[in-house]
Swiss-Prot record:
Matches recorded under InterPro entries: YbaB-like_sf, YbaB/EbfC
Protein species of origin: Ralstonia nicotianae (strain ATCC BAA-1114 / GMI1000)
Subunit relationships: Homodimer.
Name recorded for this polypeptide: Nucleoid-associated protein RSc1192
Record's subcellular location: Cytoplasm, Nucleoid
Domain of life where this protein originates: Bacteria
Alphabetized UniProt keyword annotations: Cytoplasm, DNA-binding
Matching PANTHER family: NUCLEOID-ASSOCIATED PROTEIN YBAB
Entry's family note: Belongs to the YbaB/EbfC family.
Alphabetized NCBIfam families for the sequence: DNA_YbaB_EbfC (TIGR00103)
Main localization category: cytoplasm
Its job: Binds to DNA and alters its conformation. May be involved in regulation of gene expression, nucleoid organization and DNA protection.
Gene Ontology, cellular component aspect: bacterial nucleoid; cytosol
GO MF, one annotated term: DNA binding
């Protein structure tokens, strides 16, 4: 590989690193909502997995309501939010990694970037 090609790859890698840092900052601001029980339980979190809010419909807190059901609904809403955050992160970070260009072919087979 020629010296100029290496310098070009280094510059491209540095630019991609800067783009990834900016994207990670943006992801910490993007909120997704996980829902379960037909909307009775909602979890709002960022794409960096910081939970912002948990909403539970008052009907689930009524006397005689099943505690285990409520726990299951909270867990399901949380898992739904995590899946949505992961999907959003993959989508947004895909725009950054599409800039790899020729560098993508230099990565080992099955190599996954850390995001």
């Amino acid at each position: 590989m020629m010296k100029g090609q290496i310098a070009g790859l280094m510059k491209q890698a540095q630019q991609m690193q800067e783009n990834m840092k900016k994207m990670q900052e943006q992801l910490s601001q993007i909120e997704v909502e996980g829902v379960s029980g037909a909307g009775l339980v909602k979890v709002v979190m960022t794409c960096k997995n910081d939970v912002k809010r948990v909403s539970i419909d008052p009907s689930l807190l009524a006397e005689g309501e099943d505690k285990e059901l409520l726990e299951d609904l909270v867990a399901a809403a949380f898992n739904d939010a995590v899946r949505k955050a992961e999907a959003t992160t993959q989508e947004k970070m895909g725009t950054v990694t599409s800039g790899l260009g020729g560098m993508a072919s230099m990565l080992p087979p099955g190599f996954k970037l850390p995001f």
